[in-house]
Amino acid sequence: MSANAALRCSNFDERRDKAMALFAAKGFGQVSMRELAAHVGLTAGSLYHHFPSKQDLLYDLIEELYEELQATLDQGRKALARGKPALPAVIAAHWQLHAERGLQFRLADRDLCCLSDQQQARLALVRLRYQAGLLKLVAPQTRLSGPALVATGQALGTLLNQLPGWLQGRGLAEDEGLRLMQSLLLGVIERTLKDAVI
């Protein structure tokens, strides 16, 4: 990669991160294109050369997070391959991801409704795949089916995605927060999915 190409990539990532921080701070709907352009150091007209639309940028940020969530399941698969339980590895991966991408979690939680119906539908499919993969990983023998299985996957995914935000920054040491998250989730899973592989 040439020095110019590397600089362009670096500038793009910087601008994208600045846009994400602005959306997270003010809310997607409260940010105008003019304000967004000024915040990332561009003119309003040149902003469209970098991002097709404000909505497309939000979609990319949330889609990237969902792809990273899917990748957290790989940590559980690796743990199983080493003969270890999957859930602690998955929980630790979610904890770390939340520490690294807290702003994206905020956007996905709060501003998903600002996307088009088509964008929301695509992300809903990605989220369902993630939730199904999560259940298959931690409870492959579950007897739940149909709506109960889907609802359980949604609840478990939501807990994994929300607990780090609730626990981080509460004055707990990191290892203490992670242990508390593991304890909470293990309790939920043991009571709901008695045959879960934890």
Region locations from a protein language model:
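C-terminal peripheral helix-coil segments that are non-catalytic and often amphipathic
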Residues: 1-2, 96, 132-140, 159-198
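Amphipathic alpha-helical linker/stalk segments
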Residues: 2-3, 61-88
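Helix-turn-helix
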Residues: 3, 11-14, 18, 22-56, ...
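Short coil/turn segments at alpha/beta junctions that flank glycine-rich nucleotide-binding fingerprints
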Residues: 25-29, 80, 101
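Amphipathic alpha-helical packing segments from all-alpha helical-bundle domains
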Residues: 67-70, 74, 97, 117-143, ...
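Helical hydrophobic small-molecule/effector-binding pocket
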Residues: 85-109, 157, 194
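Amphipathic alpha-helical segments used for helix-helix packing
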Residues: 99-118, 165-168
